[in-house]
Amino acid sequence: MSGQRAAKRRTGDLHTEFPTSCGNPYQTACLLSKFIELPTPPLTRHQLKRLEEHRYQSCGKSLLEPIMQGFWEWLVEQVPQWIAPNLITIIGLLINIITTVVLVYYCPTATEKAPTWTYLSCAIGLFIYQSLDAIDGKQARRTNSSTPLGELFDHGCDSLSTVFVVLGTCIAVQLGTNPDWMFFCCFAGMFMFYCAHWQTYVSGTLRFGIIDVTEVQIFIIIMHLLAAIGGPTLWLSMIPVLNVPMKLFPALCTVAGTVFSCTNYFRVIFTGGVGKNGSTIAGTSVLSPMLHIGSVIVLATMIYKKSSVQLFEKHPCLYILTFGFVSAKVTNKLVVAHMTKSEMHLHDSAFIGPALLFLNQYFNSFIDEHLVLWIALVLSFIDLIRYSVSICNQIASHLHIEVFRIKTKVARFNHH
């Protein structure tokens, strides 16, 4: 998720044989993943072929990345070479998610004070995720196991982590007392991550700025540590000169960061893409990705504002997670569209959950909105998991590799 990905370059070496079995130690997990998979493979043969031709390109370096590189280089040397890069990534993501879910349990409305250890665990969890996310690409090169699946898996985990990171930050500063600000901060974070890959879809190059995700993550770690040390009193204190509560400081930083980042993203997008006549890398309109993230944000805003029972105000964490899973799904599809040089289609099963909420409100909420929100949350989560498992398994099968294990003999060719 961070600027260190510029050094990862996990788009490596391909082969197209198909595996004959899952392997006995992993047979149960393999059967489970087959059960979860979509009935129809998400990628066509032509998309898989273009995936083989994909090359990772990035430019730019964030402010703290050179400082952190020494630590990351040391850390990857401590990892056994039999551990797969994707396994490192998923472990970091699970730690990040679990620590945030614990915080959500104690603060379901983002207004409560959680035990001190929960804030500390979130800070540690995010640091672990940042560190493991930084070394997975290094481990891939170190073990000679770089593939396009690694890049996709990395970005996919980042898209989900973004949801939990922004939610955890809002809980840490008790932003639930200001629901409009909490709504803005969470969806601004998702939107900026989407835009980073939108401009990549247009230009073919992932760009990193001076202030990028590494810096933002460290800022959020500090927020969690302050929450552990200062508690509610800290966030109620007023900021001199600005005369606003301390809890709005992260929100104001989000506004500034959104304006700065989106200005850079849209400058690239509106300059024109690398495709024919200034189109995207897939030859589509540079504005076409707006429909997907725009639909997520518009639906979320309408349901929030039209709710007769203050659905978002009373259940902000459930609400953010529901739409966060939808946002993660469409972001993943954007990354896939870039890597396979293909068009994004607007119709998507990810929108079933939000559609249920919208239709329920349209018919005067004849079903309890809280119940429908839970249904939408479950549907959105299952849809994201099924898509993610399906596409990872399909690509792994096509490249004759395994998602979480390093195969000893892999046919390779130069990707540089």
From Swiss-Prot:
According to its UniProt record, where is this protein mainly located? endoplasmic reticulum
GO MF: 1-alkenyl-2-acylglycerol choline phosphotransferase activity; diacylglycerol cholinephosphotransferase activity; ethanolaminephosphotransferase activity; metal ion binding
EC number(s) stated in the UniProt entry for this protein: 2.7.8.1, 2.7.8.2, 2.7.8.22
Q: Where is the active site?
A: H155
Catalysed transformations (reactions): CDP-ethanolamine + a 1,2-diacyl-sn-glycerol = a 1,2-diacyl-sn-glycero-3-phosphoethanolamine + CMP + H(+); CDP-choline + a 1,2-diacyl-sn-glycerol = a 1,2-diacyl-sn-glycero-3-phosphocholine + CMP + H(+); 1-O-alkyl-2-acyl-sn-glycerol + CDP-choline = a 1-O-alkyl-2-acyl-sn-glycero-3-phosphocholine + CMP + H(+); a 1-O-(1Z-alkenyl)-2-acyl-sn-glycerol + CDP-choline = a 1-O-(1Z-alkenyl)-2-acyl-sn-glycero-3-phosphocholine + CMP + H(+)
State the Pfam families in the record.
Answer: CDP-OH_P_transf (PF01066)
Q: What membrane topology does this protein have?
A: Multi-pass membrane protein
One GO term of the cellular component aspect? Answer: nuclear membrane
For the ligand (Mg(2+) 2), the binding residues are: D133, D154, D158
What residues correspond to the site Increases basicity of active site His?
A: E151
Q: Where does Mg(2+) 1 bind?
A: D133, D154
This chain is glycosylated at N144
Q: Where are the transmembrane segments?
A: 89-108, 116-133, 156-176, 180-199, 210-230, 246-267, 286-306, 315-334, 349-363, 368-388
Class of the enzyme per the UniProt entry, highest EC level: transferase
> Which keywords accompany this UniProt record?
Endoplasmic reticulum, Glycoprotein, Lipid biosynthesis, Lipid metabolism, Magnesium, Manganese, Membrane, Metal-binding, Nucleus, Phospholipid biosynthesis, Phospholipid metabolism, Transferase, Transmembrane, Transmembrane helix
- Subunit details for this protein? Homodimer.
Name the UniProt record assigns to this protein: Choline/ethanolaminephosphotransferase 1
**Annotated organism of origin:** Xenopus tropicalis (Western clawed frog)
